[in-house]
Structure formats: C-alpha cells, structure tokens
UniProtKB/Swiss-Prot annotation:
Any Pfam family: TruB_N
Gene this protein is translated from: truB
Residue numbers annotated as active site: 44 (nucleophile)
Family: Belongs to the pseudouridine synthase TruB family. Type 1 subfamily.
InterPro entries per UniProt: PsdUridine_synth_cat_dom_sf, PsdUridine_synth_N, PUA-like_sf, PUA_sf, tRNA_psdUridine_synth_fam2_C, tRNA_psdUridine_synth_TruB, TruB_C
EC number(s) on file: 5.4.99.25
Assigned keywords, A-Z: Isomerase, tRNA processing
SUPFAM superfamilies in the record: Pseudouridine synthase (SSF55120), PUA domain-like (SSF88697)
GO biological process: mRNA pseudouridine synthesis; tRNA pseudouridine synthesis
Protein name (record): tRNA pseudouridine synthase B
Catalytic activity: uridine(55) in tRNA = pseudouridine(55) in tRNA
Organism listed in the record: Corynebacterium glutamicum (strain R)
Length: 297
C-alpha cells in the first residue's frame, strides 16, 4: 500500500545560509515524502530567515498568500561595489568611505524611503522573455531590467562601524514585495559616490508570518511537521467571514453564495472551524478564489 499523503498546509522555515530556496524545497520533499512542495518569495543563498513553504494543497494557496509586506535585518557595506550587489559577487570598484558624514548617509537613506522607483539587481530571479535574469548574466548576456515601483516603509540604521576604508551599516527594512535589499545597498552606495553592497541579510517577516513561526530546516528534516494547517493559514492571512455548514458544502463544490457587501478577499469559515475557501465578491456573486477543502477530497 502507498503511504497516505501528508496533510496540506504551510511550513515556515528559518532558512540557513549557503543554500538556495530550491535546495530547501528539495530537502523538504524528502522529509515530507511528497513532490508537492513549493515556496513563496525566493531568498538568496547568502540570506537566512523566513521562507514560506507550501505542502500538498498548500502549494496552491501560496499564489493567494497575502505577502504585500516583508521585513529584513541587513548589513550594508559602503566603500565597495560588487557584480551581484552582495558579498557573493566580485568586487568591481572600491572607494574609501571612512570619511563619510553620517548625516549625509541618513539623508540618502531618506531619499530611498517611501514610494520609489527601483532598478532590480541584474543577478535576480526576475524572468526576461522566459529566462531568469541571473541565468542570462551567467551565460554572458547583457541584462537591463527596467525600474519598477516599490515601497520602502521603514529604512532604519540600527548600528554602524567604520572598518578601515569601509563604512558598515546594520539596517532594518520593511518593504513591499518585489523590493530588492541588495539594490537598496547598491543605490545607497551610488548616491554617496562610494559604492555599496550587502554583506548580510536575514528576512524576519513575510506578510503575517514571522521568525517566531519559523523552524530551522535541520529540525524539520528530523521531525517534519506543518507550521500551520490550511485552516490556520487562511485565517491568519485574511479577514474571516462566518458561514453556515451548508454554505461551506456549497463552496466546497465550487458553488457561489449571495453577495454580502464585502470588500476584498475573505476566508470563509464554518461553525466547526473549517476554513473552506477564500471568497471574493464578483458582481452579484460571492465566489471562491481558492478552495482549501474541495468536496472531492
């Protein structure tokens, strides 16, 4: 007999440094004994911290996960620019930054806060004509990614150190999805005319999920357990709409309900606590956008 499929849900991983996000997925596929594993929001190999991973039907929920905001703790080194905008690339220029005025640094940080246009780093997972930018760079192609709007709501300096010709900043950033912290380091260095790159990055929040929810990968490999089942994942991510058990059955079969004047997506929850689906008003219908518990399962 085949082993039963793992329960669907989310695993919040505290990713270690030195591996790709796909490496984490591969290890969790083995740990949970299923191919149905995927992640939301790529973390670079050098980065650590929150990586949201879906298991079984949880992979389908990832596309609907509210992750409009993310938070990071990072270290920026001013005085050197690299080919990748982080410590893993080759140093392409150096300029003595030890004499920088801290007030000038804070002024340029202020210019990189709020609604800004950001040019993503060339070595990124962004697809250009179906091929990821970092693959094109590796193959020797010239890559030019247009600037895009992002929001940096917090860009705070927690500490700083002057080390020889370098000026290191420990920073905390809260930003919209799609913001590159490496690009912030690069742009800050360019604005100060000394170059800059990222030397450390730890993601502390993805939407409603934080490091407090996260489990080290090594522990998950030893004891593979969900961080949240689908009911918990939906209600943690969206406002709740209470429905009857009968309405839950209808939604589980893909049927729609009468509109109730709702704005935005809600998690439809029955009296028994089952988050049956994500629903949204579309015209004169309250329709499903994701069914967590289909009637066929």
């Amino acid at each position: 007999m085949n082993a039963p499929a793992p329960k669907p849900g989310l695993v919040i991983v505290d990713k270690p440094a030195g591996m790709t996000s796909h490496d984490v997925v591969s290890k969790l596929r083995r740990a949970f004994s299923t191919r149905k594993v995927g992640h939301a929001g790529t973390l670079d190999p050098m980065a650590t911290g929150v990586l949201v991973v879906g298991i079984e039907r949880g992979t389908r929920f990832l596309a609907h996960m509210v992750a409009s905001t993310k938070a990071y703790d990072a270290t920026i080194r001013l005085g050197a620019a690299t080919s990748t905008d982080d410590a893993e690339g080759e140093v392409i220029s150096t300029t003595d930054a030890s004499g920088l005025d801290h007030r000038a640094i804070l002024a340029e940080i202020a210019n990189l806060t709020g609604d800004i246009m950001q040019k993503p780093t060339k070595v990124s997972a962004i697809k250009i004509d179906g091929k990821r930018a970092h693959e094109r760079v590796r193959d020797g192609e010239e890559v030019d990614i247009p600037a895009r709007p992002v929001t940096v709501s917090v860009f705070d300096v927690l500490d700083y150190r002057v080390d020889s010709e370098f000026y290191d900043l420990d920073v905390r950033v809260h930003c919209s999805s799609g913001t590159y912290i490496r690009a912030l380091a690069r742009d800050l260095g360019n604005a100060l005319q000394v170059g800059g790159h990222l030397t450390a990055l730890r993601r502390t929040e993805v939407g409603p999920f934080t490091l407090n929810d996260a489990t080290p990968l090594s522990k998950l490999q030893e004891n593979p357990e969900l961080s949240l089942n689908l009911d918990q994942a939906l209600t943690r991510s969206y406002p709740v709409l209470d429905i009857t058990e009968d309405e839950g059955v209808d939604l589980s079969m893909g049927k729609w309900l009468e509109p109730r004047g709702l704005k935005g997506v809600h998690a439809a929850v029955t009296p028994s606590g089952k988050a049956v689906a994500l629903i949204e008003e579309k015209g004169k219908r309250l329709a499903t956008v994701f069914v967590a518990h289909p009637n066929t399962l």
